[in-house]
Amino acid sequence: MVNLTIDGRAVSVAEGTSILDAAATVGIKIPTLCYLKDLNEIGACRVCVVEIEGIDQLVAACNNTVLEGMVVRTNSPKVRVARRMNLELLLATHDSECTSCVRSGNCSLQSLAADLGVSELPYEKRLMHDPWDKGFPLIRNNDKCINCLRCIQVCEKIQGLGVWDLANRATHTSVNVRGGMTIQESDCTLCGQCITHCPTGALRERDDTRKVFDALADPEKVVVVQIAPAVRAAWGESLGLPREEATVGRLVAALRQMGVDYVFDTDFSADLTIMEEGTELLHKLAHREENTFPMFTSCCPGWVRYVKAVRPELTDQLSTAKSPGQMFGAVTKSYFAELKGIDPHKIFCVEIMPCTAKKHEVAIPVMNDACGDPDVDVSLTTREVDRMIRAEHIDATTLPEEEFDQPLGTATGAGVIFGATGGVMEAALRTCYYMVVGKNP
């Protein structure tokens, strides 16, 4: 164990522990912006600097390890001056129009500026404008980028794609798509991990809420919403709702209060998907000599994009079935439209999904089997739905729980577990077992 002193407190930690982690063990919080444990420990933002007795230079707490007898000051006058100056320099190249930013209230840079009391900048603003296709599901605003490199490291080390890289030099250095390509030309799978790990609003999903509000305001439209299984567990987080209050029944009620005509459960079409994929697997197993194994699910558009971009030789091993969301859209604009006597061209189908890649999937030209229109008109992320709830001034905690509409609102346990890791495979095995044996496993 290594013994040291941090802000007057005795600390004992294992050798190799960073100063940042050592401080955290005794409840001392050192602010960070670029830091991601084990992924991005580069000290680029210089916000986590601390003073070490006997060393003239301030050092980054995130990538410097503890030493025996070290005396650390995390908030000395010297540290406070340097930390504030570093933050002001970052803000000088950052678009601070926070009121129109989707990350307002959930932005690390904004929070740190408030904590340090930075309300005016002593430096002239210098923004680095960079054109971007606003029609792509992933939106990047270079004016909000602070060059923390989080997106680069997550894409490279976790996803293994390396879509992002540094471009240009010196004061013109910025993050951009690797190799000077456009984002459409890259191998981006639209997994959304770079958005999740961006500490500012430099990366976000394309906002499609206006399309839904317009449809709700159109008396000619019949708005149908389907909710993916994973959404029910996450929709209340950004609204600050505890888990026991953020029930799927209250989400259904909130959507109806907005004016949605029918609210269905994507679990229904998850069952359809797994029956299709299970049947396909059994058929392939019966004709082994004609097929290559393993067979992969096709229900995740991010995974499908990955296979086609990075492992195209596996494309023929993907299931031929549509994703649950697309199946649901097709059923809505065919069977359901006929059942209710609704012109399918008047149905506006919205899916609420936990995935940015779904925005790409709904725009694929061949996804229009039912009536020639897109099977699904708009795909919203969980965060977009939460923004709609706030925009409508709906207090979900006051709403009584409501049930899904029928007949597309019921499902088996196989459909429900789609939202969990490994759920699709387990659902497929359960379904195949039932088809072969005639009873549940």
Give the positions of each predicted feature.
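Iron-sulfur-associated redox domains of electron-transfer enzymes in respiratory
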Residues: 10, 15-75, 79, 205-441
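Fe-S ferredoxin-like electron-transfer domains
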Residues: 46-190, 196, 203-218, 222
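Extended, non-catalytic structural segments that build the interaction scaffolds
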Residues: 7-9, 139
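Eukaryote-biased recognition of intrinsically disordered, low-complexity regulatory segments
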Residues: 1-7
